[in-house]
């Protein structure tokens, strides 16, 4: 199991991505970020008040947080640019520029806009926010893969029973997003989970 984690980490290092962490002062998030920066796994963008983030890093002895890019949503130099982008994306839903300007300071929305604008590759959140709050801006801004209409999540389950999955490794979907999927949604969840198993674990789904 540790071997799999090491393989995933090495692949991440070889294809280093820019990842946004909207919950910039959440303890588990910040400690994980410090480890990622220490190991050189990814380039991180922390969202939040810089003074508060740095104070938390000092309190918890996280010496490598200084390697992250820290962005204050209230004072982002691209705030107006992102507000215009959000307004354009949501204009068919009747969003005004004033509404967009209010949302763009929300770290979850800002993170998705940073990705949509090509300034980052991904976002990780949910330690402090609900699944619904995390997914809402992602669906409004980033949207789903073409051809996929059902949003789903996948979990990596590592067991000590080699007879299950691939040497005890199972990829499970969907356990949190779509509560009562119909037949078509189940089919899409199966396809997406199989893709995740292949790309993350190197498993040939059966």
Task: Identify the residue ranges that each predicted region occupies.
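Anion-binding alpha/beta catalytic cores of soluble intermediary-metabolism enzymes, centered on
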Residues: 1-206
